[in-house]
């Protein structure tokens, strides 16, 4: 059984001891305790985000890039930190403006708020924004299209959403990791 995200950790922790012959794979989170039938598929999102930061800084004409994260939590902070480090690696004087949408899972489901944060950043001179915010990110991408600026997507190639304004997408290839876990 594959369980994606931190919200699934508790239920897997309850079910794993009850069903010792069932294998569980947690994605993007470690279990609360060690169970022989539970493994985690973890990623180094900060590394891909570092490259996204380099890409953003390399096309920025204002030396201001932005980040919109969904829920303020360690996973999303790793995206933002890697992005900022990559941008500053390319241009030590670049300004990285970052916003988190909220502190609950609802922060991943608010495209209107994502768009508002993106417009605020664009109004401050940002010309590229990386959105690591779930569905909230679609508002960021739409705002970039509307303002004629660049956006960087996440988790899948999002170029088809707004061709011409999508600089790139930071993809972790969760599918490959899950396939490898399935074979174990």
Locations of the language-model features?
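A residue-level marker of the well-folded mature domains of exported/periplasmic proteins
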Residues: 1-184
């Amino acid at each position: 059984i594959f369980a994606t995200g931190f919200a699934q950790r508790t239920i897997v922790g309850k079910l794993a001891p009850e069903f010792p012959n069932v294998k569980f794979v947690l994605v993007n989170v470690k279990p609360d305790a060690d169970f022989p039938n539970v493994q985690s598929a973890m990623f180094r999102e900060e590394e891909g985000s570092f490259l996204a930061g380099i890409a953003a800084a390399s096309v920025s004409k204002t030396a201001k890039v932005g980040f919109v994260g969904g829920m303020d939590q360690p996973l999303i902070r790793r995206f933002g930190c890697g992005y900022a480090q990559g941008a500053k690696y390319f241009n030590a004087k670049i300004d990285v403006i970052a916003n988190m949408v909220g502190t609950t899972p609802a922060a991943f489901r608010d495209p209107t708020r994502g768009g508002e944060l993106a417009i605020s950043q664009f109004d401050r001179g940002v010309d590229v924004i990386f959105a690591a915010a779930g569905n909230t990110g679609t508002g960021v991408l739409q705002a970039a299209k509307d303002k004629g600026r660049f956006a960087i997507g996440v988790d899948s190639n999002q170029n088809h959403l707004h061709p011409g304004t999508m600089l790139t997408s930071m993809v972790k290839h969760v599918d490959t990791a899950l396939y490898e876990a399935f074979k174990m």
